[in-house]
Amino acid sequence: MMIQSHPLLAAPLAVGDTIGFFSSSAPATVTAKNRFFRGVEFLQRKGFKLVSGKLTGKTDFYRSGTIKERAQEFNELVYNPDITCIMSTIGGDNSNSLLPFLDYDAIIANPKIIIGYSDTTALLAGIYAKTGLITFYGPALIPSFGEHPPLVDITYESFIKILTRKQSGIYTYTLPEKWSDESINWNENKILRPKKLYKNNCAFYGSGKVEGRVIGGNLNTLTGIWGSEWMPEILNGDILFIEDSRKSIATIERLFSMLKLNRVFDKVSAIILGKHELFDCAGSKRRPYEVLTEVLDGKQIPVLDGFDCSHTHPMLTLPLGVKLAIDFDNKNISITEQYLSTEK
């Protein structure tokens, strides 16, 4: 297996292409059937063809299959020449188990868009570390595209813009006006009631403009590959992107302190905190940003707090491994580097 010294780029997506989906951990095609079918039907209505991974509809208690079965499911989607985009169905807890069994040579020979979030971070980061392929922290089939309107439509708008756009010029994100982290209407056939929507509270703490390569994903998942050959090296000047879901404030302090003890904060030029879904503040009324500032202990690192690339809805799509620019004065975030190939 060769390891790329420069970014490897997948071909862009086009409406009408084929998306293959895999279940690298939780068996949600079984446990959340209604939401699964909603996600499938949503993408089909948008004009995409879908290929089911071999573990679709399968369950082995807490997971979709054995470690090697799950790795084989993913590899078979890589081998399929008809597939342009490989999408996670959902996260879980055990995607890191697959990393020794993925066919990295095949990924290099035929790079495809690989997208997902949460526990899929292990695959996104590990594949980038081993191949240089730019991967995408973005929607997964069941939680994201199984969501109801209007939030699913905003998620899709970012997904299609990022993955189909011509690779010229700078792309500046438009942050959604409203968001939600309510878990209602998860697997029901009918909407029980509309979700509570909150005004976007994304905040830019810092001044000037910071540019750097973005590295990261779901922080809790990154601890499962930390220190291994599948964890991308964090370099001086990188922008650290981290998000999490349903964690307690005690856990978040531990995770942020882990980063400090590993001297990550001595290297990064900025931090992006994704919105934290259903954060448990233990009655303190403190938010993850406040925990982070205490852990930083006076160290001045600009922070974009509450970026809409996380477990909340809607979700923006973020390429990992490319340069971002965060303008703290004008309060915007942009992709400044090519992240897809120019040829289909």
From Swiss-Prot:
Q: Does the keyword RNA-binding apply?
A: no
> Please, one GO biological process term?
bacteriocin immunity
Q: Which GO terms describe its molecular function?
A: hydrolase activity; identical protein binding
Question: Per its UniProt entry, which superkingdom is the organism in?
Answer: Bacteria
Task: Provide this UniProt record's keywords sorted from A to Z.
Answer: Bacteriocin immunity, Hydrolase, Plasmid
The record's similarity note reads: Belongs to the peptidase S66 family.
Q: What is the purpose of this protein?
A: Involved in specific self-immunity to microcin C7.
PANTHER family associated with the record? CARBOXYPEPTIDASE VC_A0337-RELATED, MURAMOYLTETRAPEPTIDE CARBOXYPEPTIDASE
The name under which this protein is listed is: Microcin C7 self-immunity protein MccF
The encoding gene is mccF
